[in-house]
């Protein structure tokens, strides 16, 4: 299975100049990294998710590379146009050059109170425009401490089950247009990291749950996110249940981001 390493830039960098500098560093690092050469890039797909205001410019810079571009969110109100101040639709995001969008990140769930119903609508709109979805799930520190991880994840995965029920005509697209990113909330940006064994067991549960929804979902891509860095990437990449990484802070430094991608590329050999 092809690995994926996705850089979620969040509300960074601050200026267009900084964005271009990061892209310069990233492209230069890729060109000099043997394991991430064009011949080997098929083993690990790299994607970055810039701020919306930089999306079109980043896509323009990356159009002649193998790096894909994603949005960090999409409107749940409409797939195309409408009187929704401050929103950006899936159609508009595709027009800006993105081929994927992140949905359900814990920061969106926390700061914008995004519910399963809201995320279902966003998923429907995204996939109706052939905008792939990186769907984030994960438990809080309290839920982890009280051993509720799998229960929480099952509740979050209900969005996928409901999508299949409501949009059966789109189910065939899911194996190639849906990626799950398991990000324990307590590990995001904290430096706290679950063991590889814990992540592997959780990923196995996620894969089995998805396979139970539909036969076509028996081999889904599941990434890990949460304080992934250059130092721990090899240990995660070595586990066959972990298909890649959703990277936050470490994606803002080209060298660290490429070290993570290289780890998964080598593990896919």
Swiss-Prot record:
PROSITE patterns: TIM_1 (PS00171), TIM_2 (PS51440). GO terms for cellular component: cytosol. The keyword Chaperone does not apply. Its EC number is 5.3.1.1. The active site is at 105 (electrophile), 183 (proton acceptor). Keywords: Cytoplasm, Gluconeogenesis, Glycolysis, Isomerase. Substrate binds at residues 8-10, 189, 227, 248-249. GO terms for molecular function: triose-phosphate isomerase activity. Its main location: cytoplasm. It is found in: Cytoplasm. It catalyses: D-glyceraldehyde 3-phosphate = dihydroxyacetone phosphate. Homodimer. This is Triosephosphate isomerase. It comes from Moraxella sp.
């Amino acid at each position: 299975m092809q690995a994926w390493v996705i850089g979620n830039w969040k509300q960074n960098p601050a200026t267009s100049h900084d964005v271009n500098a990061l892209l310069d560093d990233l492209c230069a690092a890729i060109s000099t990294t043997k394991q991430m050469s064009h011949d080997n890039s098929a083993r690990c797909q790299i994607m970055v998710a810039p701020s919306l205001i930089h999306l079109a410019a980043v896509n323009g810079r990356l159009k002649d590379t193998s790096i894909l571009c994603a949005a960090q969110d999409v409107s749940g109100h409409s797939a195309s146009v409408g009187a929704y101040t401050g929103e950006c639709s899936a159609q508009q995001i595709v027009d800006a050059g993105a081929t994927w969008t992140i949905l359900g990140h814990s920061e969106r769930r926390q700061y914008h109170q995004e519910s399963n119903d809201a995320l279902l609508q966003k998923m429907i709109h995204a996939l109706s425009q052939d905008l792939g979805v990186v769907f984030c799930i994960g438990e809080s520190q309290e839920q982890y401490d009280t051993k509720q991880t799998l229960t929480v994840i099952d509740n979050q995965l209900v969005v996928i089950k409901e999508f299949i029920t409501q949009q059966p005509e789109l189910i065939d697209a899911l194996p190639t247009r849906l990626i799950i990113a398991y990000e324990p909330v307590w590990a995001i940006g904290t430096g706290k990291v679950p063991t590889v064994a814990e992540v592997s067991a959780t990923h196995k549960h996620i894969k089995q749950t998805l396979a139970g929804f539909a036969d076509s979902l028996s081999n889904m891509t599941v990434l890990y996110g949460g304080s992934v860095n250059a130092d721990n990437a090899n240990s995660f990449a070595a586990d066959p249940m972990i298909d890649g990484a959703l990277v936050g802070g470490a994606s803002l430094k080209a060298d660290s981001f490429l070290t993570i991608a290289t780890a998964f590329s080598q593990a896919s050999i």
